[in-house]
């Protein structure tokens, strides 16, 4: 009896079924809804998965049941790919020299298949308990970015809006920091004037919060006030001088 073998066409069909099941699962996940009455019936489903349920129209299944059925269909498709790949004829150069290693290879393949099925169920089944798998993990993608891509929008728009949001948040935080700093200096000056015996404690608290001492802060504010008044007075005197000079020229004419 000749051994049963598979063709490359059958292997390609099995891979196409896996891709179709992955597409159906992606659509179901993107349209996930826990309400059975609002489940989307326009979602493309695999003909292999819905072949036995075409006659039942009594009620709508929830998204959770549909996703579970899609996962089962995907599991069956992956198993079909594995079995078809094992039935493909091997090249003459890669064939074993005798029949003894072939039995060991078959056992090894079975062990690898069982390990793969266990790992797949633990890592890809959302209803299975989470099992930590060693190795590098994929970086998390922000949900808003996925929404932008699904809606056909440019991801650069998300980046630009994110930068603008961060800039506004930084400006707001900077304004709050300056406001609290000014309030700290004013409160320290008032407490120093009302409670002179706590001068050292007030100075220590102000310095611990990143500010100058009350005396230094008051001196700096006094200097700024004097400079501002002098500059304002100089501008006022200059304006008066120019006005008097203009009046003198008009009277001379």
From Swiss-Prot:
Coiled-coil segments on the chain, per record: none
Composition bias type Low complexity, residue spans: 34-47, 88-104
Subcellular location: Nucleus
Alphabetically ordered keywords of this record: Activator, Nucleus, Transcription, Transcription regulation
Region annotated Disordered, chain positions: 32-63, 88-109, 206-253
UniProt superkingdom: Eukaryota
UniProt biased composition (Gly residues): 50-60, 231-253
Single GO MF descriptor: transcription coregulator activity
Family: Belongs to the Mediator complex subunit 10 family.
Function (record text): Component of the Mediator complex, a coactivator involved in the regulated transcription of nearly all RNA polymerase II-dependent genes. Mediator functions as a bridge to convey information from gene-specific regulatory proteins to the basal RNA polymerase II transcription machinery. Mediator is recruited to promoters by direct interactions with regulatory proteins and serves as a scaffold for the assembly of a functional preinitiation complex with RNA polymerase II and the general transcription factors.
Name of the protein in its database record: Mediator of RNA polymerase II transcription subunit 10
Organism per entry: Neurospora crassa (strain ATCC 24698 / 74-OR23-1A / CBS 708.71 / DSM 1257 / FGSC 987)
Gene: nut2
